[in-house]
Curated annotation (Swiss-Prot):
It is a peripheral membrane protein. Gene3D superfamilies: alpha/beta hydrolase. The lineage of its organism: Eukaryota, Metazoa, Chordata, Craniata, Vertebrata. GO terms for cellular component: extracellular space; plasma membrane. PANTHER family: LIPASE (PTHR11610), LIPASE MEMBER H (PTHR11610:SF12). Hydrolyzes specifically phosphatidic acid (PA) to produce 2-acyl lysophosphatidic acid (LPA; a potent bioactive lipid mediator) and fatty acid. Does not hydrolyze other phospholipids, like phosphatidylserine (PS), phosphatidylcholine (PC) and phosphatidylethanolamine (PE) or triacylglycerol (TG). One of its GO terms (biological process) is lipid catabolic process. Its EC number is 3.1.1.-. Disulfide bonds join 242-255, 279-290, 293-301, 436-455. This is Lipase member H-B. It comes from Xenopus laevis. GO terms for molecular function: carboxylic ester hydrolase activity; phospholipase activity. It catalyses: 1-hexadecanoyl-2-(9Z-octadecenoyl)-sn-glycero-3-phosphate + H2O = 2-(9Z-octadecenoyl)-sn-glycero-3-phosphate + hexadecanoate + H(+). The active site is at 163 (nucleophile), 187 (charge relay system), 257 (charge relay system).
Length: 460
């Protein structure tokens, strides 16, 4: 009898606590998870606007117009980030969504709105997904209009778009005459958008600041520049660590395209290691023609990713706007490569062609070896050759340097390279001293190790 009374009492308390509470209160929403069957039959457009804030970092609230409970978490005085994905041929959620939301909330009190249009983007027919992009933009405009009516400002709107999502972001920006704060395009989709006029794709006039990264220009991405600044990591194609043959399956098709997202996520925490060097072409960058960052003083060359807006004032005033910047990356997260230029002037009377390997050493014994351009260099008397050297470690202070010269030949005589001056210029950390070594001889295939010294005249 007492036990029955106890359980009945618990039931009554539970009913009283739940009485008056809506069905949706406290409910967490998740990104739409579909499959290849949905892709084959096609999906009608249905958009979820999943809100994450410091108050609900793990429990998304849907901001659909018929759902008022989600708006209690939306603080319009904060900056709002819209993250919009692209084409989803298999229907599965993007693997990066949880990570990018978490990283944004770790660095600042944002409203993060994940634009889930998986129902619409999931189809085997890419053009069907592309045809829905303007409808998604219309839905986003209705939400932004609602936010503006509650006190939000267009300055506080930041749109991050992936592939088709980049063009969706551009369409939203056009409806506000380019007044929204910022758009970042992560490898904007190329198919059906290449060669289109500005009103039919992302363009630098769509926001106060538009920055773009291109990682798959020979495949799924857009090749030409679109923003106030366009970054081309590894030249915009063939990203390190991505499969080179179709034998790798689906990764072969999507890895380069998707790398743009992972580079951007890394930039949220790196805060400065992925430095882009303005240049006309990737080749010019590789041969050392693009090291002058004086136009950005007192800043360095622009940093790729989230912190690129620090260079906004320098970039938007260009007439016409449009800066291409290049940098190289490692194959894995955090993707950082530390760049130097190795300048060599020789006084050998005969021209020599060969390869240079350089190793840097620190006081505690750490060693990092250069990843130099694969092309051989031609060393002519009194002509300086600049080689781009890339290292996967940042050694500071650097105590010793070793250099090896080789022609790559396994037969024939061994050559000497008489060096008048060798200069190592830091590009990633430009505040560090330029290091030199003067008047020495490199014997072919013999490693020469020495202590570097500050250059006597860095203007030489």
């Amino acid at each position: 009898m007492l036990l029955s009374f106890y359980f009945n009492g618990l039931l009554l308390v539970g009913c009283l606590l739940s009485w008056g509470r809506s069905d949706t209160e406290g409910q967490c929403h998740s990104f739409t998870d579909l499959n290849i069957h949905n892709s084959i039959i096609g999906t009608a457009l249905k958009v979820q606007l999943l809100l994450y804030t410091p108050e609900n970092p793990k429990c998304a609230q849907d901001l659909n117009e018929d759902n008022s409970t989600g708006f209690q978490y939306l603080n319009v005085t904060r900056k709002t980030v819209f993250i919009t994905h692209g084409y989803r041929p298999t229907g599965s959620p993007p693997v990066w969504i949880d990570n990018i939301v978490t990283k944004f909330l770790d660095i600042q009190d944002f409203n993060v709105i994940l634009v889930d249009w998986n129902r619409g983007a999931t189809t085997v027919l890419y053009h069907n997904a592309a045809a829905k992009t303007r409808k998604v933009a219309d839905i986003l405009k209705r939400l932004i209009d609602n936010m503006l009516s509650q006190g939000a400002t267009l300055d506080s709107i930041y749109m991050v778009g992936v592939s088709l999502g980049a063009h969706i972001s551009g369409f939203v920006g056009k409806m506000y005459n380019g007044s929204i704060g910022r758009i970042t395009g992560l490898d904007p989709a190329g198919p059906l958008f290449n060669g289109k006029p500005p009103e039919e794709r992302l363009h630098y006039t769509d926001a106060q600041f538009v920055d773009v990264v291109h990682t798959d220009t020979d495949g799924l991405g857009y090749k030409e520049s679109l923003g106030h600044i366009d970054f081309y990591p590894n030249g915009g194609t063939d990203q390190p660590g991505c499969p080179k043959t179709i034998l790798s399956g689906s990764e072969y098709f999507k890895c380069d395209h998707q790398r743009s997202v992972f580079l951007y996520i890394a930039s949220l925490t790196n805060n400065g290691d992925l430095v882009g060097f303005p240049c006309k072409s990737y080749r010019d960058y590789r041969i050392g023609n693009c090291t002058n960052c004086k136009e950005f003083l007192p800043l360095s060359c622009p940093v790729f990713g989230f912190y690129a807006d620090k260079w906004k004032d320098h970039l938007v005033k260009k007439n016409p706007p449009g800066t291409k910047a290049f940098f190289d990356t490692a194959a894995k997260d955090p993707f950082c490569i530390f760049h130097y230029y190795l300048d060599i002037m020789t006084w050998s009377s005969q021209t020599r062609r060969g390869y240079i390997t350089i190793r840097l050493m620190s006081l505690n014994g750490n060693v990092t070896e250069s990843k130099l351009d694969k092309d051989h260099a031609t060393f002519e008397q009194y002509k300086e050759v600049s080689l781009l050297a890339k290292f996967d470690q940042d050694l500071d202070p650097m105590t010793r340097i070793s250099v090896t010269f080789t022609t790559g030949s396994v037969i024939g005589p061994k050559f000497k390279l008489r060096v008048l001056r060798m200069r190592l210029r830091p590009l990633t950390n430009t505040n560090r001293p330029i290091l030199c070594r003067y008047d020495f001889v490199l014997l072919e295939n013999v490693e020469m190790e020495f202590n570097p010294i500050p250059c006597e005249d860095t203007n030489l």
